[in-house]
Amino acid sequence: MDTSEEAIVRFCRRYVADLLEIEVDAVDPEADFDHLGIDSAIAVALLTEVEEHYDVDVAPETLFDNPTLRAVAVYLREQLARRVAP
């Protein structure tokens, strides 16, 4: 599985676009969640999907500390790298 930052961003963008019923290109990974129309229910759904897809635990406050898809991807990449580091 590709766990690069860009792969995580692509995964999150596709998931959010599907939930919001918009084109993937309309999901700016640099935009704040509220600007994208991501409410708490969608944020929780995204969090759950990310946890299942990448087999990682993510605390809910992570989304508040990282309020863009890019920031979430950076955070996840760091968490995944720590998990596989010797």
Regions found by a protein language model. Name each.
Residues 1-25, 76-86:
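Thiotemplate assembly-line natural product biosynthesis machinery
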